Amino acid sequence: MTTDTDHSQVKLDVPEGTQSLEITRDFNASPDKVFRAHMDPELFVKWNGPEEITNTIREWDPKTGGNWSYVSRDDNGEYGFFGSFHEVRENERIVQTFTFEGFPDAVNLEIMTLTDLGDGRTRLSSTAIFDSVESRDGMVAAGMESGIVEGYNKLDALLAEGA
C-alpha cells in the first residue's frame, strides 16, 4: 500500500511495506498556540477527531512521564484511547504512545515536531510507528485520514478564534 495524499492541507505518506506513516500539516498559528492546543485538555477535546465525535478526558498529565486517556463518542458508540507522554518539549516536540482500547496489544509511538515557519505559521510533522504493517494499514482503512483532516480543520477554526 503506497499512499501519498494531500487533503485539505494534510499530507499523509503511507510508505509500502513499513510500519509507519507521516502526517504533515501547516497551521496559521504560532508554535506555542499549536502546542497548547495539543496539551490543554479543554482545547484538545474541541478539535480532536472527526466532526461527529465528542471527547471526554479521563486523565491528562501533559508532561514528560505523564499519562493521558480519553473517550470519543459518536452515534455508533464510544471508543477509549490511552497512552503516555514520553517527551514533552514546549512548543517543539511531543513523543507519546497511543493505544486504542479495542486493540490493547497494538501500541503505537507518535512523534510530533513543531517547526516555526515565520509570519505566525507552524508546520506540524508527525510520525506514527505501528506494531505491524497490518496494524498501520488497518488504521488507514478504518478512516484515520478523514479523522485527521476533519480534526485539523476544527483545530484551524479554533486557532482562528484565538485559542
Q: What do these predicted ranges mean?
A:
Residues 1-6, 87, 130-163:
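A conserved amphipathic terminal alpha-helix motif
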Residues 1-54:
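Hydrophobic ligand-binding cavity/cleft-lining segments
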Residues 20, 95-149:
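Beta-strand/loop substructures that line and gate deep hydrophobic ligand-binding cavities in soluble
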Residues 22-23, 42-78:
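Short beta-edge strand/loop motif at the mouth of beta-sheet-based domains
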Residues 24-25, 57-60, 81-87, 98, ...:
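Hydrophobic/aromatic beta-strand elements that line small-molecule binding cavities or substrate pockets
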Residues 31-32, 63, 86-92, 114-123:
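A short, structured loop/turn motif at beta-sheet edges
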